[in-house]
Amino acid sequence: MKPRIVLKSSSLMPSWDRPVLPGAPGCELAGGVARAHPIKHGVVVDWDALEGLWERLMVGGLQVHPEQWPVLVSDSPSAPPKGREKVAELLFEALTVPACHMANTALLALCSIGAFSGLAVEAGAGVCHATPIYAGHSWHKATFRLNVAGSTLSRYFRDLLVAACPDLQLQGLSRKTVTQLKKRCCYVSLDFQGDICDPARHQRACFCLGNGCYVRLGSERFRCPEPIFQPSLLGHPEPGLPTLAFQALQKIPTTLRTRLANTVVLAGGSTLFPGFVERMNLELEAQCRRHGYPALQPCLVAHPGRDTAVWTGGSMMASLNSFQCRWMTRAMYQEHGPLLVRDVFD
C-alpha cells in the first residue's frame, strides 16, 4: 500500500499570497514568489499557507472535491490542543469537508503494522518523538520530543560539504540536491567515536552532485546523521533519540513496560539511514542495562516502507468498518463548535 502523492509540507507563495503546489503551473510565474513552510518542528505556524496547500493537494493533486470526502488528519504527539481546534475550523469552514478525524502520528505508525500498543519512535523531517501507546491511547506525560530531525541534518550536511570541498563553491547547492545526496550517501556509525578517531575506518566514496561536479566524502557520511543520537554536536541540550525512547519506557507503569518494549516501531524518513536500526537497538539495550533493567529487551520493528508509515496507518484505520462511527461530522461541528475535538479525539 503506497500513497498516490508524496510532497513536502511547503508551498510557493506568489505575490497575491496564494500558495501553489511545487511543480504546479503557478510555480512558473515570474516575480514575487517565496516558499512558505506551514509546519515547523511538527507544529503549524502558517495556517493560510496550510489551507492553500491542502486545497491544491485535494483539488489539483488528488483531483477530488473536498466537500465530498471525509478527511483524516495526523498531527504531532506534542502539538498543542488548540491546533486541533484550528484544524477543525479549516476543514469544515474553509474546505467544507463532510467529516474529519484527527489522530497523532505515533498511533498511526503503530496502526501501520496492525498494533494498538507499543512505543512509536519517529524521526521525520521536522521533529523526532518517542511516544508510548496503550490500547490506542497515547501517554502524553511519557512523550518526548527532539527538534533535531531530517531538515536539521540536511542543513548540517550542507555545512559539512562546504567544509570538505572548499574549492567547489557548494554554498549555492539547492536544498533538494543536498537532501538527495544525504539520502544516497549517509549512514549511521555503530561506533562514532572510534570511527572519528580512525580515518582508516571511514567509508570513502565519490558522489555526483548532478551538475557535473563530484565530491569525495569520508567522515561526512556518518557525521551527518549523528546529531539524532548526539544533539549536543549541534548545540542542542536534549538527550539523543535512544535515550528519549528509554525515558518514555521508564515513565509508563511497570506492569506495561515489557509489553510496550516488545513493540518499538520505527517510523519516518530519517530512520532509513543504513545503520540506524542497529544503532538504535544497541543504545536502547545499553540504556536498559545501565539503569537496572537487564531483563527488558526492546524489540524494534522497522518495515522497509516506514518513511510513509503514518500514511499507511491512517489509510488502514480509515478503511475499518469499526472506525466509521468515529468521524466528527459537519453537523456535530455546527452544533458544538471546534472545542468538540477535545472530547471526540484522544
From Swiss-Prot:
SMART domains, per database record: ACTIN (SM00268)
Coiled-coil stretches: none
InterPro entries linked to this entry: Actin (IPR004000), ATPase_NBD (IPR043129)
Pfam families hit by this protein: Actin (PF00022)
UniProt record similarity statement: Belongs to the actin family.
Protein name: Actin-like protein 10
Organism: Mus musculus (Mouse)
Gene expressing this chain: Actl10
